[in-house]
Amino acid sequence: QECKCHGLSGSCTFTTCWKKMPHFREVGDRLLERFNGAFKVMGGNDGKTIIPVGHNIKPPDKQDLIYSAESPDFCQANRKTGSPGTRGRVCNSTALDVGGCDLLCCGRGQREETVVVEENCLCRFHWCC
């Protein structure tokens, strides 16, 4: 929530307040935190309730993320899902996030390759002095 005062000479005769969205980065960080703590669940016999699977004792609350099926392994090619896998992809060796080699190469290691590209820049030299 953010507020602004109104009035003569800065006196706060009345205040206007409004709800404000958090910064995009903050929203992403919250989602990642919830994703990393997501609960695996299965449906109850009554068809309405969910039951946590595994060693989780506390049932998930309304703000927790839940899932019922494991995600496929995107590291390996899978014809059934149409996933080409990550083998042979270009990665960033210095990045620690999604495009980084540690995550993208799935622990297989990577091969570094330096590519030199020569291009004709159509530059011209002008003698000035």
Curated annotation (Swiss-Prot):
UniProt xrefs under PROSITE patterns: WNT1 (PS00246)
Claim: NAD is one of the keywords in the record: no
GO-annotated cellular components: extracellular space
Post-translational modification: Palmitoleoylation is required for efficient binding to frizzled receptors. Depalmitoleoylation leads to Wnt signaling pathway inhibition.
Disulfide links within the chain: 3-17, 5-12, 75-106, 91-101, 128-129
GO process terms (BP): canonical Wnt signaling pathway; cardiac muscle tissue development; cell fate commitment; embryonic camera-type eye development; embryonic digestive tract development; heart looping; neuron differentiation
GO terms, molecular function: cytokine activity; frizzled binding; morphogen activity
Similarity comment: family membership: Belongs to the Wnt family.
Full protein name: Protein Wnt-6
Origin organism lineage: Eukaryota, Metazoa, Chordata, Craniata, Vertebrata
